[in-house]
Amino acid sequence: MANRTIIAFDFGTKSIGVAIGQEVTGTARALTAFKAQDGTPDWQQVEKLLKEWQPNLVVVGLPLNMDGTEQPLTARARRFANRLHGRFGVQIALQDERLSTVEARANLFDRGGYRALDKGSVDAASAVIILESWFDEQAG
């Protein structure tokens, strides 16, 4: 297995969570959350992050309904992924992110109660779950 560095984004219209991980260990950690204006981040911040970490792959969470069908936000997440590829030339993978926010909120609450549930922390923790889910799928 390659030791690729992978960044994951939890796309949202107001905030975009970010996590980083190593494929060889299959683990991820929260990095940050970017403010977004109707789904559009500060692209300079994104560029700085990508230059700093130089990921081999970027995983973008794909928000689906519980039955697996797409919702309006699904197309916006795909567009965000396409823009990442177009602007920065990074390889993209999409990952089902159903229930990642619910799981992230529960994990953070277990560690720090309501004080731990600020929006940025939840979004970055969701990105961790998205990336670890992607690792699990790759491992089979």
UniProtKB/Swiss-Prot annotation:
Q: Extract one GO molecular function annotation from the record.
A: nuclease activity
**InterPro entries according to UniProt:** RNaseH-like_sf, YqgF, YqgF/RNaseH-like_dom, YqgF/RNaseH-like_dom_sf
Q: Say which enzyme class the record assigns.
A: hydrolase
Q: Which GO terms describe its cellular component?
A: cytosol
One GO biological process this protein is involved in is:
rRNA 5'-end processing
Question: Could you tell me the keywords of this UniProt record?
Answer: Cytoplasm, Hydrolase, Nuclease, Ribosome biogenesis
In short, the EC number is: 3.1.-.-
Known Pfam families for this protein? RuvX
Q: Please tell me whether the keyword rRNA-binding is annotated for this protein.
A: no
Q: What is its main location?
A: cytoplasm
Q: Does the keyword Cytoplasm apply?
A: yes
Compartments, record wording: Cytoplasm
Question: What's this chain's function?
Answer: Could be a nuclease involved in processing of the 5'-end of pre-16S rRNA.
The family this protein is said to belong to: Belongs to the YqgF nuclease family.
Q: Would you tell me the protein name for this molecule?
A: Putative pre-16S rRNA nuclease
Species whose genome carries this gene: Yersinia pseudotuberculosis serotype IB (strain PB1/+)
Upper taxonomic lineage: Bacteria, Pseudomonadati, Pseudomonadota, Gammaproteobacteria, Enterobacterales
